[in-house]
Amino acid sequence: MTALPIRGPVRIIGIDPGLRRTGWGVIEAEGNRLIYVACGSVEPPDDLPLSSRLLAIHEGLASVLSDHKPMEAAVEQTFVNKDGVATLKLGQARGVAMLAPAMFGISVAEYAPNQVKKTVVGAGHADKQQIAMMLKILLPKAEPPSADAADALAIAITHAHHRQSTALRLKVVGV
């Protein structure tokens, strides 16, 4: 896996996994400076069987990774809800979202939804509108085509914010 550099610009992809729409957002971070690169979503047809939808997500993310060449990746963790089957299916999409960057040799960090909201908005229970408002401030050139792409940018921002402490922790333990 790619090491986490502490200095210099780093390109980060944030991924918001989902079976219907997997959002992705790419930014560059250097210190506190964030630069928007691109965002979008992978949307497999609903009528495909599960295995084909997962393949479409993988191929779509692989294309984004190849085109934008991020150095690090961050994926949102899945929260468990009352529908166990839906949670398991989302977990499969999340597995694909983690596998795709790993196949490119890119380290993958994970963040809880509340941590993403708290990092970007300042409140762990922020809504989609609050996230969108902060994205306009933090990444003024970004115009996410969907809430999933916006969430993916928020995940990338969260990683940019927390990666310094992660890199220092890894350095201390000798990784």
Curated annotation (Swiss-Prot):
The RuvA-RuvB-RuvC complex processes Holliday junction (HJ) DNA during genetic recombination and DNA repair. Endonuclease that resolves HJ intermediates. Cleaves cruciform DNA by making single-stranded nicks across the HJ at symmetrical positions within the homologous arms, yielding a 5'-phosphate and a 3'-hydroxyl group; requires a central core of homology in the junction. The consensus cleavage sequence is 5'-(A/T)TT(C/G)-3'. Cleavage occurs on the 3'-side of the TT dinucleotide at the point of strand exchange. It holds the Pfam family RuvC. This is Crossover junction endodeoxyribonuclease RuvC. PANTHER family: CROSSOVER JUNCTION ENDODEOXYRIBONUCLEASE RUVC (PTHR30194:SF3). SUPFAM superfamilies: Ribonuclease H-like. Belongs to the RuvC family. It is an enzyme of class 3 (hydrolase). NCBIfam families: ruvC (TIGR00228). The active site is at residues 16, 76, 148. It comes from Bradyrhizobium diazoefficiens (strain JCM 10833 / BCRC 13528 / IAM 13628 / NBRC 14792 / USDA 110).
